[in-house]
Amino acid sequence: MAAFVLRRLVQAVLVMLTVAFIAFMLFQYVGDPVTNILGQDATPQQRLQLRADLGLDQPFPVQFARFVGNAARGEFGLSLRQGRKVSSLIAERLPATLELSMLSAVIALVFGISMGVYTALKRGTLLSQTLMTISLLGVSLPPFLIGILLILVFAVTLKWLPSFGRGEVLALGPWTTGMTSLDGWKHLILPAITLAIFQLALIMRLVRAEMLEVLRADYVKFARARGLPDRSVYFGHALKNTLVPVITITGLQLGSLIAFAIITETVFQWPGMGLLFIQAVTFADIPVMAAYLCLIALIFVVINLVVDLLYFAVDPRLRIEKPTGGH
């Protein structure tokens, strides 16, 4: 177990160093931070002084080492567009993105697994066929189109739910949440459903495929031959083994909820990190772009590490010590 965790940690560090290098290259080759800060009318002396202040006159390895050290402390400098610390901007926007992503993940997991099990056990029924058709649409349609359709139906036509913004939020120390008010929930429903639909359909189809394969396994047939009730066979034996490969895919998909919330946040003008990143790209705000890249990579690395540990815990084959020699 310790060796397994150590290998994963080493891999995580290597991945983060690679991402940090890519983010650092943004500062080197995408725009000129001196020009972005001082403008075109700055004198050569002012430009040289600022380059020295920013450490841009130092050797490449020194600059990269300093960048990694600052990134490890969460320091990415000042936003070129807003003139504020990037860390404070991220801290303001992160709660909104996490709140949206976590609710979307719950929706995708609860309904995806439930519907996947149902369509596997009742695959000949009309409802099962209907759910499979709807899931195909969920996988095929792009999120921005789903969001626009939901806005058209529930915000414009029926006027049941708002179409943009986060609504009323409550500050709990550094954290802000909209889940403490009805207005906040109303603003959260449409973007959460939009973000969850693709993941829900993917999880549903994956669970169904794995469930059908497991139900044909010999140990399931043996459990039925022993006279075990269907509930015990389906949920005590089949579903447990179905979730082993599902865990890996689901974990990575949950990470993508945060990484790819950009489109959903843009459609609904949700004040999260995705919208901040789009604004940073529009104005070539390199510090914000670099911070977003590193943070998303860190989230993926952490989720992947947790998924590996869960996989290790669920699948007993991984806990069997490999022989050290011989045949």
Question: Where are the predicted features?
Answer:
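Hydrophobic alpha-helical transmembrane segments
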Residues: 40-55, 132-144, 190-196, 232-249
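Residue-level recognition of pore/gate-forming positions within transmembrane alpha-helices
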Residues: 12, 20, 43, 108-109, ...
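Hydrophobic alpha-helical transmembrane segments of membrane transport/permease proteins
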Residues: 15-65, 158-180
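Membrane-water interface segments at the C-terminal ends of transmembrane alpha-helices
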Residues: 23-30, 58, 69, 134-165, ...
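Alpha-helical transmembrane segments of integral membrane proteins
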Residues: 2-3, 94-127, 156, 173-327
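Cytoplasmic-entry segments and transmembrane alpha-helices of multi-pass inner-membrane transporters
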Residues: 1-7, 11, 114-150, 244-246
